[in-house]
From Swiss-Prot:
Swiss-Prot/TrEMBL GO biological process terms: box C/D sno(s)RNA 3'-end processing; rRNA methylation; tRNA processing
EC number, UniProt record: 2.1.1.-
PANTHER family per the UniProt record, alphabetical: FIBRILLARIN, RRNA 2-O-METHYLTRANSFERASE FIBRILLARIN
Species whose genome carries this gene: Saccharolobus solfataricus (strain ATCC 35092 / DSM 1617 / JCM 11322 / P2) (Sulfolobus solfataricus)
Family affiliation: Belongs to the methyltransferase superfamily. Fibrillarin family.
Disulfide feature: none
Function comment: Involved in pre-rRNA and tRNA processing. Utilizes the methyl donor S-adenosyl-L-methionine to catalyze the site-specific 2'-hydroxyl methylation of ribose moieties in rRNA and tRNA. Site specificity is provided by a guide RNA that base pairs with the substrate. Methylation occurs at a characteristic distance from the sequence involved in base pairing with the guide RNA.
SUPFAM superfamilies: S-adenosyl-L-methionine-dependent methyltransferases
Binding site for S-adenosyl-L-methionine: 89-90, 108-109, 133-134, 153-156
This protein's name: Fibrillarin-like rRNA/tRNA 2'-O-methyltransferase
Subunit-structure text: Interacts with nop5. Component of box C/D small ribonucleoprotein (sRNP) particles that contain rpl7ae, FlpA and nop5, plus a guide RNA. These sRNP particles form homodimers, giving rise to an asymmetric holoenzyme.
Top-level EC class: transferase
């Protein structure tokens, strides 16, 4: 296996780039829980610090960063509501980034999958798993505070509407949303670019200002991620 030569801070807080002796580069985050990985990712020791390799083929946020995300609203101390947290791959890296003074509320609908998320959260006190349906934010309103960032990665035809509805409950004015648009979950017959355009129009008609749209290919085919700011 290739060995790490250097680890450098990127222009995004708490996100690093690891360079290996085979000439390759990988994103990584500083491991909040040393000696433990989450999804089989490589642990990298460099100058007394342990980092976790962040696989862009397993995490759409990592893919977005490698595809040119201009700014990452998730930083040290950020409060995040994550819809579609699944078994914890991406939210574990969010946990590394926000550190212990941040909070990541992870909503997941599948009882089987949320059990895996609970195992991740047992070692990471800044992750708060919630077994809930994102279509009904009223059901977790009593436990989720207002957040700085809403991250949405759910495979539903009305995924954008669900995101907007949750923003009305939880996202601070001038907060940021990262919405993963899964074109094939919305309409398998349409050109993904047309779907992205339609979904962005929905956001803009609901007081969101579009900052950036990123096509996630080759990391995730027929997916885009939209960064927008909520105007309330």
């Amino acid at each position: 296996m290739s060995e790490v030569i250097t680890v450098k801070q990127t222009n995004m807080e708490n996100i690093y780039e690891c360079e290996f002796n085979d000439g390759s580069f990988r994103l990584c985050t500083r491991n909040l829980v040393p000696n433990f990985n989450v999804y089989g990712e490589r642990l990298i020791k460099y100058e007394g610090v342990e980092y976790r390799e962040w696989n862009a083929f397993r995490s759409k946020l990592a893919g977005a960063i490698l595809k040119g995300l201009k700014t990452n609203p998730i930083r040290k101390g950020t409060k995040v509501l994550y819809l579609g947290a699944a078994s914890g791959t991406t939210i574990s890296h969010v946990s590394d980034i926000i550190e212990l003074n941040g909070k990541a509320y992870g909503v997941e609908f599948s009882p089987r999958v949320v059990r895996e998320l609970l195992l991740v959260a047992q070692r990471r006190p800044n992750i708060f798993p919630l077994l809930a349906d994102a279509r009904f934010p009223q059901s977790y309103k009593s436990v989720v505070e207002n957040v700085d960032v809403l991250y949405v990665d759910i495979a539903q035809p009305d995924q954008t509407d669900i995101a907007i509805y949750n923003a009305k409950f939880f996202l601070k004015v001038n907060g940021d949303m990262l919405l993963v648009i899964k074109a094939r979950s919305i309409d398998v017959t349409k050109d993904p670019k047309e779907i992205y355009k339609t979904e962005v129009e929905k956001l803009e008609n609901s007081n969101f200002e579009t900052i950036q749209i990123i096509n996630l290919d080759p990391y995730d085919k027929d997916h885009a991620i939209v960064l927008s700011k909520y105007k309330g």
